[in-house]
Every structure is written in structure tokens, then in C-alpha cells.
């Protein structure tokens, strides 16, 4: 009896290929698409600059902000472009808004621009998609960074940096310094929690801070009668724009004190053209010529939907394999930057139906949160310790015979050719381009002072006009596409090797340490964290999280001995002439065993996973005691991934 296959969970699928691979009459059509990409790119650059200038001026005048909706952004885009004399007249409210924006543009922004006319002929649909993107940019920036702004504001107002320096000067022993700095951090953490807490007026911080907290809440938390579910964090996700003016206020205060600021306004600083979205109507407007018939024959009376397959076949090789996948069919929409092309596919059973997309991502489960282990008890356990140098270090046991596998950052760099491409681009830039970019770096794009930001805009627009011809070369976009393909190739090669060593997805489950990097570390290349777990899930593996508390610093062989760095060597950085301890090599104080740090961590993760699956208590030397739980609880509930780690409740 054949088992009926179930369709995949994802409604949409994206396939990225070269535009040349799918476009017919490439020499004729590609220049038209490329020109549209460049026009859209210029419009976005100017729109984001103009919006920041207008919103700053509006805030300084009214101490509030207008609603940043699709109508407002679309009007901003169109007043920056050459006005069309044809078409139906706009609605009254749109005309009034456009007049207001035009007056501001002529007075404040036009003098900062070069003599260049923008136009959006046949680009109405493209502008609508870009409008949605800008709304998303603003709202995502607020949702992700508002809490960070509050924390930075508190640190600056209470001079955390200065106080820390003074403590380091005054206190003579390392123990005293660390203890005093820790107390200061705990005090400020309580202040931040009190500021962000709208449910409880009983402040947890010292009474010394209470009057300041009450005063500042008026400015850094929106003034509203009711927060959704009486919770600031939930309300932030529902109504992000309510928090933008608070972010502006905080960063203005930080800037007044001479500190570097974050930018509450999204900007496009990169000059290399980005992707635009093309749908069937845009194809008809942009590319359809008299050879294919009259445009009106396709645009009206429902003919656009009826003939969409025919229209796409005029210009694209839709018979190619990339347009049809198992379970999926072409959704008649692509994104392109003139060189690469991302084809959007829709699940066949959802074609013509209204699609409800679940915006809440699936929460990753900790292994000890599962209620039933019967399905996975017979499967092989692979423990993975994620890190910086070894992106993943895998083991399938806690003894000498355990199989090991690692995927390193050096290997990824080599296979993706990122270093090679970086050098190639640097050679291409030569001295003139670097000189221009160095000159621009002297101006502050993040400033919330209108005069300073105007100076930046003027210089940026001038340098852009000089550098457009250089950065619009196809080489930059080709290297970006090649980098994407190389990353896919490297990751698939790694997955294939993993399968050979540890078995396929039906035989194996994977337990990841819950390492989470909230911010990018200086001087380190970007790494895949959550993305690595997603990669294994997409390849069919069941993945679970493990609380990796003490997994690296406790010996997995003797069960609890402290592992410490012991080997000293010269610092590999040529500009530092000191000796340093080797980070990746540890020695156990108890049994004198020498460990690779990642191997020790992965082995401890394996022990925790094995115990959880077989209903055995977590090893005691890897448990949190009461003070550890309290320390974890004292951290901001808005920045921690979990309120309490699952293992802490089980082992306390």
C-alpha cells in the first residue's frame, strides 16, 4: 500500500538563477530591465534621505510625527520624480499632502541634489512594491532595536562608560574591579527593567533612581491610554510606529552628549543596484511592443489574468525546469537586479486561493521540553556545538570511539571565495574610488541634527553622481550572485558529508547548543547561527536545542573538573607584540586531560541530550544553581531568548 505524500509546509518557494538563463532576446530586453532597476535604485536612495529630512523637521516643529503609511511614502517617491501631465487627478487628501511635500522638497532637499531628473514611467507597480518594502524597513527597525535604544539611553544618561573607566583606575585588584563593575551593571539593569515595565509601579531599582525613571518614562515610552495586552513588548510588535518618536528623542539626547548614535531612519548607503519586483502588468507596460499586439488588449477586461502564461512566454523561457518544481508552479512574479533573477513559485494546491501566512515563526524546542521520547529513543543522537572558528563541531558519543565532524569558517571562506571576491573588488576600486569614499566617511549619516544631515546629503548625492557609473557595472552583481551559489554549494557539500558520517534524517536527530549571538562581534566574519539549524531542518533532520550552560568549561571525561586555558603563544595579530593564551585548547585541572574546546562542549551537549531522551537527570556539574537562575532572571526579559532556561527548573 502506497503512503500518500503530504505537501511541504511552505506555501512559497524561491529559485535564484542568472537572468541570462531564463530571458529571451537577452541583448534587447536586458538593457530595458537594467535601466528600470537603476531608476528604482536612485528613487529609493533619494526617498529614504528625503523622508529622514522631512520627518526630522516635522519632529522639531511639532514634537510628533505623521503616520508613515503607504500613501505618505508613495507621495514622497512621486514628488521626487518628474511629474506626469497625464492620468486621472489625485484625491483631495493626496493632492494636499503632495503640495506640502513639494514645498518642503523645493526649499530644503532640492538644493542638496545634483541636476538629475528622476522619472517613474511604467513603474507604478514597482513603486507600490518598494513602498511596502520601506514600511517594512521602518517597522522592523523599530521592533528589533527599540529596546536596545532604551538600554543605550540609560547607559549614556548614567555615564556607564565613564563610571567603568573610573572603577578600573581606582580599584587595584581584578577581583575588586570585576565585583564593582558587576554591581554597577546590576543596578543599571534594574533601572532599565523599571523603565520598560508598564504593568507594575513598584520599582525594583534603588529609590535614588525612582524620580528619574518617572520623569523619563514620559519621553521614552509612548503616551497612550492602553497598551495591547497591557504589555509593552507585545504592543511594540503590534504598533511599532508609536515608538519611533521616542527613539528619535533618545538618540537626540545621546547625540547632544557627544556619543555616537544609532540611526532610527533606514537608509540605502550601498550604490550597487538592488532587486526590484516584476509582475505581469509591469511586463506589459515595460517590455510589450507592437509585435506582440496592443497593450490595452492585455490590460483590460480581465485579459491580464487570462493571458499571463502567454505574456511570460513572450519574454521568458518558462518551459525551463527552474519554473516548475515538485508541488510548486510559477506564481508569475520575479525579483531581479538586472543580473540575477529570483523566481517565485506557489504551492499548486494554493493557486487561485486566498493565502493566510502565519507571521509567528515556529518556536524551536528544547530537548527536555518534549513530553514523549518514544519516537526518537532508537535514533542516533548527534550533538553540535556552534562557534566562531568551527561553525559546527559534531560528535555522536561521549567516548574515544565517537565520530567527529566539523565545518570551519576557514573552509567556508575558501569554498565561497569570499576573500578572493573581496580582493578583486578592492583592486577594481583603485585609489580614486577609495578617496571619494574616505571623503564621505568624514560626514555623519546617523546624525539627527538637520544641519549636519543636510551636509551629509549634499556630499552623498555629489559623490553618488560620480560613482554611479562605476558601481552600476554588472561585475558587482555577478560576484554577488556567484557568492550566493558558492554558499549553497558549500552548505550542500557539508550536509552530504554529514549524512555519510552520521546517517540520514530517518536515522539521526540533532541537538544544537543554544548559542545565540545578539550582535556581530568586531573583527570576526558573519556566521550562521539560527540559519545553521534551519539548514539541517530543510534537509529533513529533527533539530532540538540544549541549554549549553558550562558545557565548554567543565570536563566531560571526569565529569565536572574545571577546564582552563594553559598554552601561551605569540599573538597572531601583527600589530600586537604580546603573548596570549590559546583560546581553543583547554586542560582539566582535575584529570589533566587536554581538550579541544569545541569537542569538549559537543561531548557535554551529547551527555545532556542522551540523559533527557532516556529520562535521566541532567549531569549535576552542568546544572544551574539558585544564584545562576537569579542572575539569569535579572537580565532584561526583552533581550533574553527565554525567561528561564528549561534545565534550570529541572535541576534546581
Feature map (PLM): residue ranges:
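Positively charged, helix-rich recognition surfaces that bind polyanionic ligands
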Residues: 1-652
